Amino acid sequence: MDRHCRVRAPGAARPAECPPPATRHAGLAARLGNARLLTLYDQATWSEGPAWWEAQRTLVWSDVVGRRVLGWREDGAVDVLLDATAFTNGNAVDAQQRLVHCEHGRRAITRSDVDGRAHLLVGRFEGKRLNSPNDLIVAHDGAIWFTDPPFGLLKPSQGCPGPQELDHHGVYRLPPDGGALQCMVGLDHPNGLAFSPDERVLYVSQTPEGGTTSPEITAFDWRDGALHNRRRFAVVPDGLPDGFCVDRQGWLWSSSGAGVCVFDTDGQYLGLVPTPATASNCTFDLEQRRLFITGGSTLWLLELQQ
């Protein structure tokens, strides 16, 4: 993808003003080492949807309200990859190293090709418009999984307000062969999602605004083409579990009001990576030596031990 516009010249990151990571778990302490959080960029309006783009060695993320998709490069430069977006939120990279996006405004899943434009993949389920696709992942088989809460319908700064045509907030699977979109489960304001390393467990955060459902990360077993054994996996101690990622050993790193919370495979809380502002999402690079965190106007970096 050709560079559209450079908004930050190459240069070094600067330390973020926040406490160091806190943990009593020896394994997590070893993974964190003496790392301190670094600020890579802080001129976005609302940072979300980080994804590592290995082909370009670039961290891609969204400035949702600013209607841009940005790219941080390893020399410190930041480029606008997509401009005047339809309130893009979640991003992912498929096996062909193409960028895939959730668009609040178009109420759709799109894919960016070499011309730098986002092309529609799916925007309807059983003839009705999707709500406001929020976050997505690409599975090993090439299927695209995404959440579809109504946030972009309710908040003008995050999308295009309009009537909700569907009677549910779904978690969907778009088959890799171009088959019909599948609604795998309905949840209360589903938000972030990720698979376990072996893709036998799907994690989805629920972030309801009011009502009787509490914010939590929910787990499902994925087998035989369906989700089974729904259960509460974890609750963050501060704020909401928005976006999250899972490392190679199966630990889940979740955004929260205080930073990034880390949970083991049983949902036990291991520790916290504090951030200066509420964290919205996080992801690793390919080697999982770097954790990228979005929140507010900012993209942060934490360099990890193997």
Language model features with spans:
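Sequence-structural signature of mature extracellular/luminal beta-sheet repeat domains
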Residues: R3-Q306
